[in-house]
Amino acid sequence: MMDALRVLLETSTFNEVLRGLAISILLAKLTQSTTSSSKSQGSTFITASGFILIYFFARSWLALVNHYAPEPYLDEVFHIPQAQTYCEGRYHEWDNKITTPPGLYLLSVGWHKLVRLVECTPSSLRSNNLVATLLIALIALSCRRRIEAQTAVGIEKSAVSFYAYHTAINIALFPVIFFFSGLYYTDVASTLVMLVAYWNHLNRVASHSEKPGFLNGLWTVVLGVAALFMRQTNVFWVVVYMGGLEAAHVVKGLKPKPVSKNDTPDFVLENIRDSFGFWLRRYAVGDVHDPPVDMAWPDDWALCLLSIGIAALCNPLRVLRQVWPHITIMGLFAGFVAWNGGVVLGDKSNHIATIHLPQMLYIWPFFAFFSAPLLIPRVLSTLADLITHARTPTPSHTTTKDPGRSSWRFTKPSITSKKSSTTKPPQRSGPTPASSSSSSSSFSPDTNSSGRGFRFILDLVLSRKLYYPFYLLATILLSAAIIHYNTIIHPFTLADNRHYMFYIFRYTILRSSLVRLALVAAYTLSRWLIWKRLEGNNPPLRDLAGETGLKITKNKLGWRDEFSASPFVTQDFYGPKTIKTDEQKNIKDKQKEVEEEEEEEEKEDWLIGGAYTTLSLSSTQPSPATSSPPTSTVLLWLLTTTLSLVTAPLVEPRYFILPWVFYRLLVPAMPVSSSLVSSSSSSSFASSTTESGNGDGNDAATAARQQQNGNGKRGLLWNIIRRTDAALALETVWFLAINIGTMYMFLFKPFYWKTASGEMLDGGRLQRFMW
């Protein structure tokens, strides 16, 4: 260890420190919002601190690797000589053992010419990935900023939230990415190019009114081809994921004329054909069903895919005008496959495409392990909800049971949740609910309808989500069947004990078939936790709206009525209100008061520092960072992940990098009141709003205002600290700990391959542990 410290001190020259600081400050300046004020110098320094952490941590890792493993190691044995061949201008020479395209080597040649490096040495080639890691943080920040801008309003659209910044830093520190920042592998550069392509895609869908031009389409093709030059499997992310998102963007921007409730046929047995025909026509004109993922159940997933698919098929020219670059990329890739005789370059015998469905089971524990700090708030929130609902009796003033909310309402609300009879929901492009004075509870039996039994069953199955336990059981049985019939153990997994996956398989999957089946529980729980984390958590506002029928308009949460286009939601879902008028008015007054206070606070925050104080983490006014992604986006992510993984017989953590990166970019922020920091303010507000109308909640609002005013006087640093999600900070610490552990194993725990008789193998070279 003393030798390692000496190496770090020797490489940390004054010029090196200045270079690192200059690069970090430059990157921080590039992230600054155009709305930042003259006081943004402090925020620039704090922004730079994240890049400083990445630079010096990665620089130290690179220096140690160059010292302890100066010669090419493992796959570097193929990559470094090939890059050196390109550096010498011999572009027609190719090592047939290399299976990936030459994108990494071309980037290296360009980088060496840019910085005027004469020779392509192992250390100089490895340094390419250090630069790429810094750029990953920068581009990831831009991508997350664009994602948040999709639900932002006003000044927030041009802002950079602290959550976006912290997320970008953590993505760059992701252990499987960061480890290869010190080695010459394709993964870091491939991730960077994919993020650039994704950033371009987000710019293309930034507006429904402004269509991307032809030159931008050509640029999209160039970026897509560049991504394919890094890895062949990137075609799924460029074509399926980004192309699918752009197709969905087009059909959601059609904006059909709204229809009245009187023109909407009721979904009853004798009218089922007319109802289906009506909704097929509505989907055809773009009235699609795409709720936020935290409001969607499996039936919503099916309706989402169906409605968007119908809309795309019925509007082919509009869709083609948007997605032609992705179709072009797919055509070019198909031409390459035909010319090459397959997807893989070089050694095709050990990389044969095989249907390997267990990959979609292995990925969930992988995600859960690395996302453990982010899952803690969700677990605690679920446990708290379970305890609360178990202890809290039904309010005495509630005269009608809410049939629109499922029995699993503590998990998430349903889009079939009851609305108030006196508060009209905002009009959307689909049917609008009529006054509930003409209806009772959800799908209540109608004595004038012969289909009341059908509606009652529909109520049980869809409104109360009676099918959900059967859905869970089906996923468990399907997982068990996949394990039993499709488990594949690639020879490389068992032949190389230098990879961590060797030991994971050895002590779990290879133990016995019983252990394999027992792991279904881990796969199921991990999948549920990851999905719930994608949903985010905004319980105070949503529970408040669901219980009282408060009007939810186009707020920062993005929860609005306009996404609902389901034939199963009728006027009967909007039952009589179950709360006193005075009590509802009291809640509205308190909500309005807190919102006004938060607006004033946000104005002050903007003036303090544009890049850091844009994220409002209050319980009643969630910022765009807390908005859950649309269901279509998550389903496309899941589809693309499946396509990119199930064709690979070999299980490698590196294959999970892009699925994890895109998942992490979609994860919404957790309100501070829902994080590990404190939930006192949220609890006080939630409890005050559920009082029986006596106005006791005003004390909580006053206390919160006094606390906020006091905190605002402590300056930028305190503002950042109190707005920082502790789970996000814990994720940073978690990644640093994992990185230090894997660095230690690679550098200081080498071993030799020996036969049973003690004879050295592999020429007596040191072997090292790695991902």
UniProtKB/Swiss-Prot annotation:
Subcellular location(s) per record: Endoplasmic reticulum membrane
Q: Name one GO biological process term.
A: protein N-linked glycosylation
InterPro entries per the UniProt record, alphabetical? Alg10
Family the entry assigns: Belongs to the ALG10 glucosyltransferase family.
Give GO terms: molecular function aspect only: dolichyl pyrophosphate Glc2Man9GlcNAc2 alpha-1,2-glucosyltransferase activity
Recorded catalytic reaction(s): these are: an alpha-D-Glc-(1->3)-alpha-D-Glc-(1->3)-alpha-D-Man-(1->2)-alpha-D-Man-(1->2)-alpha-D-Man-(1->3)-[alpha-D-Man-(1->2)-alpha-D-Man-(1->3)-[alpha-D-Man-(1->2)-alpha-D-Man-(1->6)]-alpha-D-Man-(1->6)]-beta-D-Man-(1->4)-beta-D-GlcNAc-(1->4)-alpha-D-GlcNAc-diphospho-di-trans,poly-cis-dolichol + a di-trans,poly-cis-dolichyl beta-D-glucosyl phosphate = a alpha-D-Glc-(1->2)-alpha-D-Glc-(1->3)-alpha-D-Glc-(1->3)-alpha-D-Man-(1->2)-alpha-D-Man-(1->2)-alpha-D-Man-(1->3)-[alpha-D-Man-(1->2)-alpha-D-Man-(1->3)-[alpha-D-Man-(1->2)-alpha-D-Man-(1->6)]-alpha-D-Man-(1->6)]-beta-D-Man-(1->4)-beta-D-GlcNAc-(1->4)-alpha-D-GlcNAc-diphospho-di-trans,poly-cis-dolichol + a di-trans,poly-cis-dolichyl phosphate + H(+)
Residue ranges under compositional bias (Basic and acidic residues)? 584-593
Glycosylated sites: N448
Q: Where is the composition biased (Low complexity)?
A: 411-426, 435-449
- EC no.? 2.4.1.256
- What is the protein's known function? Dol-P-Glc:Glc(2)Man(9)GlcNAc(2)-PP-Dol alpha-1,2-glucosyltransferase that operates in the biosynthetic pathway of dolichol-linked oligosaccharides, the glycan precursors employed in protein asparagine (N)-glycosylation. The assembly of dolichol-linked oligosaccharides begins on the cytosolic side of the endoplasmic reticulum membrane and finishes in its lumen. The sequential addition of sugars to dolichol pyrophosphate produces dolichol-linked oligosaccharides containing fourteen sugars, including two GlcNAcs, nine mannoses and three glucoses.
Acidic residues bias (residue ranges)? 594-604
Q: Where is this region: Disordered?
A: 392-449, 584-605, 682-708
Topology in the lipid bilayer: Multi-pass membrane protein
- TM region(s), chain numbering: 45-65, 160-180, 182-202, 221-241, 293-313, 326-346, 357-377, 469-489, 503-525, 631-651, 656-676, 728-748
Which keywords are on file for this protein?
Endoplasmic reticulum, Glycoprotein, Glycosyltransferase, Membrane, Transferase, Transmembrane, Transmembrane helix
Pathway note: Protein modification; protein glycosylation
One GO cellular component, as annotated: endoplasmic reticulum
- Please report the name of this protein according to its UniProt entry: Dol-P-Glc:Glc(2)Man(9)GlcNAc(2)-PP-Dol alpha-1,2-glucosyltransferase
